[in-house]
């Protein structure tokens, strides 16, 4: 049975699977990577790659809104990391990540798991052989740097596209109102 604090969180419509996993690890409720650049004016966080309004309003989002953001972020990780790490063994990667007590959502994508494994290796290169990534420890830093460059470019392009769509819709609505 969950503790009283967890019950309170649950009463605020946070799904149980976001709070406790089957082995009592606390699941991540936010994609935050601990280095938010939106506080300095970035439209896209350089850490988690959420849009600035998503960072600001995250705690007010519904479970469905959270899921939509997670899916976009995971799709971006898949698009960048899966091709960068073609020799990765996902079973070993997942076992490695879980052995380091990294919190993963049950629906975490292959790219999300690769991201956490690469991040662990970037901080501790001696983990590389056990990570399942299929790379040499000397490849970690160049791969991490290339990943960071590509993922931020993709996230920024995604933000720009969303902004252009919203602007186009608003311009269309203004035009319709002016005609009436």
Regions found by a protein language model. Name each.
Residues 4-7, 12, 116-118, 167, ...:
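Residue-level marker of intrinsically disordered, low-complexity segments enriched
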Residues 6, 16, 69, 73, ...:
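Generic structural signal of hydrophobic/aromatic residues within well-ordered alpha-helices
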Residues 31, 44, 108, 129-131, ...:
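Generic detector of intrinsically disordered, low-complexity, polar/charged segments
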Residues 82-140:
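Short flanking/linker segments adjacent to small metal-binding domains or redox-active Cys/His motifs
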């Amino acid at each position: 049975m969950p503790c009283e604090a967890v019950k309170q969180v649950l009463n605020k419509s946070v799904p149980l699977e976001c709070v406790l996993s089957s082995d009592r690890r606390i699941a991540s409720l936010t994609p935050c990577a601990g280095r938010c650049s939106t506080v300095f004016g970035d439209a896209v966080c350089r850490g988690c790659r959420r849009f600035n309004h998503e960072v600001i309003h995250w705690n007010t989002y519904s479970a469905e809104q959270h899921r939509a953001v997670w899916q976009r972020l995971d799709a971006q990780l898949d698009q960048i990391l899966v091709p960068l790490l073609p020799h990765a063994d996902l079973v070993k990667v997942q076992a490695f990540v879980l052995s380091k007590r990294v919190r993963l959502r049950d629906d975490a994508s292959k790219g999300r798991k690769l991201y956490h494994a690469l991040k662990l290796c970037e901080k501790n290169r001696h983990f590389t052989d056990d990570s399942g990534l299929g790379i040499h420890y000397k490849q970690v830093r160049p791969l991490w740097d290339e990943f960071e460059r590509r993922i931020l470019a993709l996230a920024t392009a995604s933000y720009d596209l969303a902004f252009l769509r919203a602007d186009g819709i608003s311009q269309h609505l203004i035009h319709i109102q002016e005609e009436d």
